[in-house]
């Protein structure tokens, strides 16, 4: 007969972000443990709050299945020696089955006698096996662990109680001096201890003690109560899954309430108010029906509605104290012109090994001007970029950003607007941090995109120059994210930037005008490869076939926009009927050139043509060389493929005449160079 098994670890309050991952880990480890021990079960449910990690194993078998089976061992000639004595092989076979050589018998199978044993073993009781749950607790991992008392044992937070019930039977799992029983704890302030008669009583018993053990149920309670408040007051609340998830795991019994603050604080930029409420206090900001931020907030209490007025008042006082600080910083910062803050950047270190923030600003302007010229950007964009690059780090020395570091860039935008700067300049100051995460939003303005790329290129170049290069396991300065951001912005703006050409030019440009240690020439390619790896990440993220990714990255192409264009062409036509013969013809050319070790140092000489097919290929290649679009280039290869095949049918490539041979290899080399624009096609998997 199957019964439910309840296992609860009761702790001091855990950080909210740790709880869901920890209870999932507990369930996964338990699932593996039960399967390894041959205990059948239906499913595992999880329950979790800041003070408990709980699993409920549904329909767990009371014992392992009994074993009644025949095990085949070594052949008789291996199991016994010439005198009939048991060999080590036979002894090991028997021992491995929990038996002795006395239990071995022989039977013939396909003309050969083999050793067999008949294994009969009664399955172990679940109650005995479940004592091993203590090992699961010991094996659990966490970002940070704690020790308590004088023990060496570590856990995410000190353990205060354990519950271990198989049906109505206590399984006395033990950790340190704590032995599991049937008593759990209710809400820290509102509930009492509860003695559980049966594992199935868990959820309902805790509800009576103001603990909603099911995290999804708590989340639904929060959402429903918020919806009621919003509807009642004609408000709007923007969805925030991360904050909702966090408050769900901060409380055991959620009660939603609304608070307010003086309207005078609404003169502060919205982002400051939202940060004060959301990031510092875990409040949801509130908007009116027109989407305008208003002087109200919604929060979640860990408890019921008793004394809710006192709770609201206390939360309002805490928020107002933070808003008073924010108002002070805002007023103080606005007393000074932007130039006051820009001048102070010379005293701000970008990095000890690289130099000051003022020096970085100088380098970034030079990089941006170089890129703008390369991309032939309009004069107004260059003008706005130059001004934005002069200002873009000034807010780092404002009091507001000193208190709210997460608002760097945002406050720069607001202060620049207040100072009368052009909107493009102001927005670019904010956008240069974008994307803030790997897949975060990109800059929406051209100036912002240019400033973001220039800033990130400078960071990567100078960190590589200072020897602070990411390893496979360590990237403390987020250089991979910066490089990925560069790739995403380039592709979004459709800007061409072959890094093998550009990086040496940028480094040469910066040398002599900045004290930062810049990479030597032998590091140029290392940086280019580093950024190229982020192109691979982009292609993988966008679901390109693995062989197409391998092909386009194995080409000599260094421009991310061209690499993406090639990948799009190959992905689009991968399943076309013509794709296989085109690729086979082009890879045949590469194989011939590789075998001949031809380096392409010979010009094609029409006077050496001996057949019309050579002229046809020559003209076809010349036409393809005029094509810029990779999509059109592929279609050109589709048209050229029969010409290539005819060329091979008629001509002996490795002709005895050295000049003719080299001329034909030169023709093939010209085709190969064009094909390389699409990728190293030998990497493609063609079916």
Swiss-Prot record:
SUPFAM superfamilies: HD-domain/PDEase-like. GO terms for biological process: arginyl-tRNA aminoacylation; glycyl-tRNA aminoacylation. It catalyses: tRNA(Gly) + glycine + ATP = glycyl-tRNA(Gly) + AMP + diphosphate. Its EC number is 6.1.1.14. It comes from Lactobacillus acidophilus (strain ATCC 700396 / NCK56 / N2 / NCFM). Its main location: cytoplasm. InterPro entries: DALR_anticod-bd (IPR008909), Gly-tRNA-synth_bsu (IPR015944), Gly-tRNA-synth_heterodimer (IPR006194). It is an enzyme of class 6 (ligase). Keywords: Aminoacyl-tRNA synthetase, ATP-binding, Cytoplasm, Ligase, Nucleotide-binding, Protein biosynthesis. Tetramer of two alpha and two beta subunits. Belongs to the class-II aminoacyl-tRNA synthetase family. It is found in: Cytoplasm. One of its GO terms (cellular component) is cytosol. This is Glycine--tRNA ligase beta subunit. The keyword Plastid does not apply. Disulfide bonds: none annotated. GO terms for molecular function: arginine-tRNA ligase activity; ATP binding; glycine-tRNA ligase activity. PROSITE patterns: AA_TRNA_LIGASE_II_GLYAB (PS50861).
């Amino acid at each position: 007969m199957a019964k439910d098994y309840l296992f609860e670890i009761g702790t001091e309050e855990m950080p909210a972000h740790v709880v869901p991952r920890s209870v999932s880990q507990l369930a996964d480890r338990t699932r593996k443990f039960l399967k390894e021990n041959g205990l059948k079960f239906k499913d595992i449910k999880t329950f979790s709050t800041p003070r408990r990690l709980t699993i409920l194993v549904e329909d767990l078998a009371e014992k392992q299945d009994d074993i009644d089976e025949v095990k085949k061992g070594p052949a008789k000639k291996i199991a016994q020696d010439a005198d009939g004595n048991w060999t080590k092989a036979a002894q090991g076979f028997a021992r491995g089955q929990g038996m002795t050589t006395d239990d071995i018998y022989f039977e013939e199978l396909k003309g050969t006698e083999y050793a067999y044993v008949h294994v009969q073993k009664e399955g172990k009781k679940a109650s005995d096996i479940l004592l091993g749950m203590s090992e699961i607790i010991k094996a659990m991992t966490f970002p940070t662990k704690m020790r308590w008392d004088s023990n060496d044992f570590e856990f995410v937070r000190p353990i205060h109680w354990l519950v271990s019930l198989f049906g109505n039977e206590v399984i006395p799992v033990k950790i340190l001096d704590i032995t599991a029983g049937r008593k759990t704890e209710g809400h820290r302030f509102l509930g009492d201890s509860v003695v559980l008669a049966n594992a199935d009583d868990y959820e309902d018993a805790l509800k009576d003690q103001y603990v909603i053990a099911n995290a999804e149920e708590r989340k639904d309670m929060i959402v429903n109560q918020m919806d009621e408040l919003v509807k009642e007051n004609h408000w709007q609340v923007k969805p925030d899954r991360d904050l909702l998830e966090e408050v769900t795991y901060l409380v055991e019994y959620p009660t939603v309430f609304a608070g307010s603050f003086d309207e005078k604080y609404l003169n502060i930029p919205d982002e400051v108010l939202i940060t004060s409420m959301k990031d510092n206090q875990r409040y949801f900001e509130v908007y009116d029906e027109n989407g305008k931020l208003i002087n109200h907030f919604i929060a979640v209490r860990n408890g019921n509605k008793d004394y809710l007025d006192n709770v609201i008042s206390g939360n309002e006082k805490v928020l107002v104290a933070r808003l008073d600080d924010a108002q002070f910083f805002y007023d103080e910062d606005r007393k000074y012109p932007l130039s006051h803050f820009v001048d102070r950047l010379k005293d701000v270190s970008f990095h000890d090994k690289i130099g000051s923030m003022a020096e970085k600003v100088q380098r970034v302007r030079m990089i941006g001007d170089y890129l703008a010229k390369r991309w032939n950007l309009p004069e107004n964009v260059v003008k706005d970029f130059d001004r934005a690059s002069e200002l873009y780090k000034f807010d780092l020395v404002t009091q507001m950003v000193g208190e709210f570091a997460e608002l760097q860039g945002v406050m720069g935008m607001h202060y620049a607007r207040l100072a009368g700067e052009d909107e493009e300049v102001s927005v670019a100051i904010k956008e240069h941090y974008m994307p803030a995460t790997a897949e975060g939003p990109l800059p929406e303005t051209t100036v912002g995109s240019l400033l973001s790329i220039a800033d990130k290129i400078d960071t990567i170049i100078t960190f590589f120059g200072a020897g602070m290069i990411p390893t496979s396991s360590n990237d403390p300065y987020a250089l991979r994210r910066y490089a990925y951001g560069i790739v995403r912005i380039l592709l979004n703006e459709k800007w061409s930037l072959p890094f093998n050409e550009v990086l040496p030019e940028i480094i040469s440009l910066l040398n002599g005008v900045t004290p930062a240690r810049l990479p030597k020439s032998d590091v140029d390619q290392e940086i280019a490869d580093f950024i190229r790896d982020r192109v691979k990440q982009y292609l993988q993220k966008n679901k390109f076939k693995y062989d197409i990714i391998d092909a386009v990255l194995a080409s000599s192409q260094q421009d991310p926009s061209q690499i993406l264009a090639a990948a799009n062409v190959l992905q689009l036509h991968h399943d076309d009927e013509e794709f296989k013969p085109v690729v086979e013809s082009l890879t045949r050319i590469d194989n011939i050139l590789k075998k001949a070790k031809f380096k392409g140092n010979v010009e094609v000489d029409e006077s050496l043509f001996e057949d019309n097919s050579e002229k046809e290929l020559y003209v076809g290649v010349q036409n393809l060389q005029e094509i810029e679009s990779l999509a059109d280039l592929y279609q050109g290869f589709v048209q050229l493929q029969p010409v290539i095949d005819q060329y091979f049918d008629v001509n002996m490539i490795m002709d005895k005449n050295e000049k003719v041979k080299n001329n034909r290899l030169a023709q093939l080399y010209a085709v190969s160079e064009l094909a390389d624009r699409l990728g190293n096609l030998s990497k493609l998997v063609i079916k």
